[in-house]
Amino acid sequence: VRKLQVFAGVATVALMAVATSSRAQTASEAAPVALDEIVVTAQKRAENLQDVPVSVTAMTGAQLQNQRVGDVLALSGLAPGLQIKTDDNAANPRMFIRGIGVNDFNPGTASAVGVYVDGVYIASPLAQLAGFYDLEQVEVLRGPQGTLYGRNTTGGAINVVTKKPSSTPGGDIAVEYGRFNAVNAQGGFGGPIAGDDLSFRISGLYDKNDGYTTNRLTGNKGNDANRWALRAALRWKPDDKLTADLSLSLNQSRGGSIWTYNRSILPQTAEATGADGFCKAGFYTSGQCTNALGYANTSGNLYEGDYRFEGKDIVKLFGATANVSYDLGDMTLYSVTSYQRAARDDWEDTDANPLQVISARYIALQETASQEFRLQSNGEGPLRWVTGLYWAKDDLSNDSHYDVLSDLRNPTVDNPTGMDPANSIGVFGWPLTLKSRSWAVFGQFDYDLTERLTFTGGLRYSVDDKSIHYVSDVDYGLVTLFVHDGDKSFKSLSGRLGLRYALSDDANLYATYNRGYKSGGFFTGQTADEADLEPYSDETVDAFEVGAKSEFLDRRLRLNAAAFYYDYKDLQVYTTIQRGLLTVQYFTNASAARVYGAEAEVEARPARGLSLTLGASLLHAEYEDFVSVGEDYSGNRLPSAPKLSFNGAIRYEHPLPVGDFTGQLDFTHRSKVYFDTANTERLSDEARTFVNGQVGWKLDGGRYELGVWGKNLFDETNILDITAIEGLGFDAFSMGPPRTYGVYLRARY
């Protein structure tokens, strides 16, 4: 609350300062400037954001750069209802929109929020944490997108649009240096190769820091970053009808594996024992709480631990995309072709203590090919339509191993390795392959019933064929617990109905119904019970939304608001359960869930040089009917679904005798969240507010800019996730960076 008051105070001061300075300006200089028109492709065609009957937040490349959004994780909180977390340093972000997402970190589980780059669905969670650079825009679509986007978008979608080649020569570069010896350099350049017919753009990223977590055993730093990326793009436009965009991209991350904070939870005294049998709050660092091997972490510093080894999280990505369009006159044919390859090798010290309780190794390779054809109407007649075909092939090879309680091995003549699976002692492995084949046919149309009233209808039929080969073994195949083979076909019909009414040229009302669909499948996590591998069902949602989009004061004030209600059936849920000493993963369907709430976004330009934005979300998200493995979760809140969240920014630019001053202050706030389905209090996090700022100096009409920046200025505790590993006696905290700050230099030509 204090931080929100500070932000409000700064906003008031900024407005007073602008009012004072404007009196010294001429009438022309003081005239407010209208808000920029925002063009989005949420409905697979370029449209004014205010005319699109979908809840969309759009952020330009410049806005992302000013807020230091380096990947999809950094988008968390920047759009109403958007929360993102991870338990890894280089892969597997978990995205939630309006409380809808999947808590599972395994690469075989698709998110409920689809990520798209230049129209291509990024199927692999291994690739969804790739660095952002050289971007034109990012769009966050809230609500099911089952018609035009299809499977795995019951929560929504994130559209990432990269900068395209141009026949006009140009380039830009940005370099930053900050706390933890952080270096970030990114940029791009391009121009014509053969007149206006053929042009290119090459862009890249280098991002490295020493890390913000300390190993007490060695003094070394962890949770570091070391990644680079390169993208080469060509645009061929031989005439006004044909446009072909081709791109190749490489990404590589070789930073350290995640270092979590270990909270000991097994009480060793009656005084420290809580009602649930675990340690009471307030005793975790007292020395009266240990893990399964008796280690007691007595430090409350969430950015340090006793790490036996310092592993690496290596991710290598390759992508090739071809976007081709051909104007046929009354319609345009589009083709989107893509191939993606993602490989990962992650070795992490999961328990964060000097004793060998548990360590993990994750090795994965995922290859995806996809093809989409769309035929869309041109022109501005009363009927506008799009129809298409989609096909995708996805192959995953995954090999996970947990080395559990190796210090308790007792080799004998009869058992030379000392493994004891019955007591969870050994190296437990789960090598698997998962193959998916998907296709869909879809169509959507808009028809103007009158000059002001427009009807929208759409349908999509989807088929997903999946097969799995899964092995559960001990000590790298020395003992095989079971082998499972399964296959199943999932079919679904999703769609959309809507009405949009134009009150005026600057105000629209809309009401929509969407049927969303998330394909069923096979669990690809770690289990010792073959029954857990029975296929889980499709997730479906009936979503109702009403909204208003309006602009006032000669387009100096923009207000968009929406209210929504979701009725979920068979919501896919990831959780953990206890089997012996081992905490194992479990994936199932909740019978029903209910989500409803409201959102609003305000953007204003009250005076020349001053921009204000504010977003708010009020959310109710709970399981209505969910009984699993003997536990009743009905009535519990969904994970990562805060009841209240805000985001906002103030930006001011003002001419100086030499150059221009730029200043920005932005914030995100969310209320309390739970990280598990059981709503366990110790696995929750209180309300958090993060405030960031930037002050800069622009020269030569904005061609050059230098300045200072800070993120998390008040050093708010930055907990991304808390995972209970109760069988081994600890909770693992995944931590985001503390306060960071630095300097930057940008140039363009």
Regions found by a protein language model. Give the residues of each.
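Gram-negative outer-membrane beta-barrel transporters
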Residues: N378, R384-V386, F455, Y565-D567, ...
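Periplasmic-side early beta-strands and strand-to-turn transitions of outer-membrane beta-barrels
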Residues: N159, S166-T168, E176, G188-Y284, ...
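Membrane-embedded beta-barrel scaffold of Gram-negative outer-membrane proteins
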Residues: T321-L328, T332-E348, A502, N508-K518, ...
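Outer-membrane beta-barrel translocator/receptor signature
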Residues: A110-A112, S124, Y133-E136, R142, ...
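Acidic, small-polar-rich N-terminal luminal/periplasmic segments of exported/outer-membrane proteins
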Residues: V33-T168, V546
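C-terminal beta-signal and adjacent terminal beta-strands/loops
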Residues: D567, P657, T668-D676, W697-Y749
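Outer membrane beta-barrel strand-and-loop segments of large Gram-negative receptors
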Residues: A360-S377, D420-A422, F428, L434, ...
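N-terminal Sec signal peptide and the immediately downstream disordered periplasmic leader
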Residues: V1-Q67, L73-A79, D240-K241, A320, ...
